Amino acid sequence: MKRGCAIAVMICGLITSVSAASAADLIVQEPVFEPLPQPALAGWYLRGDIGYNFKSKTGGKWDFWNQFEEPYRGVDDTFNYDDFSLKGGASYGVGVGYRFNDMLRTDLTLDYFRASINGRTNCRSYVKSSHGLNPVEDNCHYEDNSKASVWTAMANAYVDLPRVGPLTPYLGAGIGAAYVKYDTWKTSEICPTCTLQSDKDGFDSWRFAMALMAGVSYDLTDQLKLDLGYRYLRVNGGNAYGYDEQDRQVINQYGQGAGADGPQAKDNGFNIHTVRAGLRYEFR
């Protein structure tokens, strides 16, 4: 009897060992999930904007060329504009950008606008006297008129602030370059006895530019945003126009000598305030 019990215990132990081993063999390993590859364009976005530039006042100066013979020939006075302004008008822009995370994004933008520019300078007292005018009265001034085409290429960075429903406010800043090209300048001397009318070739130049932005975007869809914002753009000063044909002449009615060359006038740059509306499409 004792021998039979021992054999039964051994058989039960063997069965238990085999069952445990089988159970170990049946342990299922947890699956390892690999992240799905991101689409090639994920994070990138395209943008397009239209805006309105408000009229902006600036400053400038121009040199008066004395046409008489040596030793008087040459620049003998420099006038500062009493009023120099860039008229308001539409602006247009496109850009491509990349979103790094929910807060930080950057883009490269190209913008264009064209605007009329006007300058006014009061005549000096000796100019008034030469026309037989009272030198202390406001009775004589110069007017300069042209148009300027301005392209800006900017690198910008933005911080998107916490969302409020479908709205995302943001702040931004940018640096870059502006290409300013003036049309022909029309100059007139305005007074009862004045007759001066002249055309002067406009200059073009590359200049440093910087910008500050603020605005809010509205989610039209998960990928398409309506952007409403404000931009302040600073464009550094540069050459505006050259001398007219009479100043460039070597021989004129007053004698002969070196003709004028190079820029006659320079502007002090522009401070441009713009309200803009645009669309931004983000790839996912």
Curated annotation (Swiss-Prot):
Record's protein name: Uncharacterized protein BAB2_0314
Keyword Iron-sulfur in record: no
Pfam families xrefs: OMP_b-brl (PF13505)
Segment forming the signal sequence: 1-23
Keyword set, alphabetical order: Signal
Entry similarity comment: Belongs to the surface antigen msp4 family.
The keyword Signal is annotated on this UniProt entry: yes
Coiled-coil positions: none
